[in-house]
Amino acid sequence: MTQPTQSSTWQQHLTRAWTHRGWLAWLLWPISLLYGVLVKLRRSLYQAGIFKSERVPVPVIVVGNVVAGGAGKTPVVMMVVRHLQARGLQVGVISRGYGRQTHDCREVCSDSAITDVGDEPALIQRSTAAPVFVASRRVDAARALLARYAQTQVIVCDDGLQHLGLQRDLEICVFDERGVGNGFLLPAGPLREPWPRAVDLVLHTGTPPAFAGFSAQRTLSRYALMADGSQQALGDLAGPTCLCNKPLLALAAIAKPENFFTMLRAQGLTLARTLALPDHYGFDSWSHNDYEGYTLICTEKDAVKLWPLEPDALAVPLVVTPEPAFLAQLDARLDRLLPTDPSPTLSLAHGHTTT
């Protein structure tokens, strides 16, 4: 049985309204027109140089989306980082650090408090071992990263398609199975900015793809991670011979928790209970006694917050596997930006301005 989420009724109605052009979407449409004017005005002010857009001396790859409510970009960020690391490149990651309670610029370390850095940056750092910095202004994070890790050759920005204060060289826009929803701007639809717009690469993690772009498969790893980094085969948790000796309780504090539960069941796991929590839930009110009779299994993003409270919880990584053509295009575009000289220092003239 799935616990109800703590999302309010109006948020649920709004999310449903974003899938089609019903009465609620049309009711909110005039506000969307005003929002669209403000979005265009803001971009124009950057293009005119009234608002400052700054460049850093290494290529910047922005991975983001144009829809509200999450489209699975963080697993794509980690996939891109690992791919670049496999090429032998020194990669750094920057992020705003959504949900953190601090406002300064800081490095994400293995012992950083989630409230100080945010759950997604903590997950990226733990999963990839790349240096990660968070700041309200991405350019501040990028500069701090380069000052601390001078050999960095590429910066990957987690989210930030709409953060025009940092110039970028490549933009990857991620879509899930919702595509652009009803095609309206906020609040009548899910779009943060008008679509289509120029980006370098479009990656669809949903099936079937909503429109032209590259495709990627989302699957769960065949193993679960423990807090100490050791692995437990998911097959050992499946069926009546489950080695955990306790019923499984699956929990997820992500945009679409039911997708996680469905994927676990597809791996043969029997879930005695499921617990759907709001995205970025902080576990501040978590009570161990309420769940002590269960083996807890969760997403990687939840685990970085849950492990201090439940060190025996299991985390199942989400694996994003893009079609080979996507990585080929990414490499080809990036190779044009990287210097032939092995030195990581680049001229400020590299790349292009996307604002």
From Swiss-Prot:
Keyword Nucleotide-binding: yes
Any single biological process term in GO: lipopolysaccharide core region biosynthetic process
Organism superkingdom: Bacteria
UniProt enzyme class: transferase
Keyword list, A-Z: ATP-binding, Kinase, Lipid A biosynthesis, Lipid biosynthesis, Lipid metabolism, Nucleotide-binding, Transferase
Reaction equation(s) it catalyzes: a lipid A disaccharide + ATP = a lipid IVA + ADP + H(+)
GO cellular component, one term: plasma membrane
Keyword Kinase recorded: yes
EC number(s) given by UniProt: 2.7.1.130
Residues that, per the record, bind ATP: 67-74
Sample GO molecular function, one term: ATP binding
Pfam families, A to Z: LpxK
Pathway in which this enzyme or protein is active: Glycolipid biosynthesis; lipid IV(A) biosynthesis; lipid IV(A) from (3R)-3-hydroxytetradecanoyl-[acyl-carrier-protein] and UDP-N-acetyl-alpha-D-glucosamine: step 6/6
InterPro entries: LpxK, P-loop_NTPase
Function in brief: Transfers the gamma-phosphate of ATP to the 4'-position of a tetraacyldisaccharide 1-phosphate intermediate (termed DS-1-P) to form tetraacyldisaccharide 1,4'-bis-phosphate (lipid IVA).
PANTHER family reported in the protein's UniProt record: TETRAACYLDISACCHARIDE 4'-KINASE, TETRAACYLDISACCHARIDE 4'-KINASE, MITOCHONDRIAL-RELATED
NCBIfam families: lpxK
UniProt record similarity statement: Belongs to the LpxK family.
Protein name as annotated: Tetraacyldisaccharide 4'-kinase
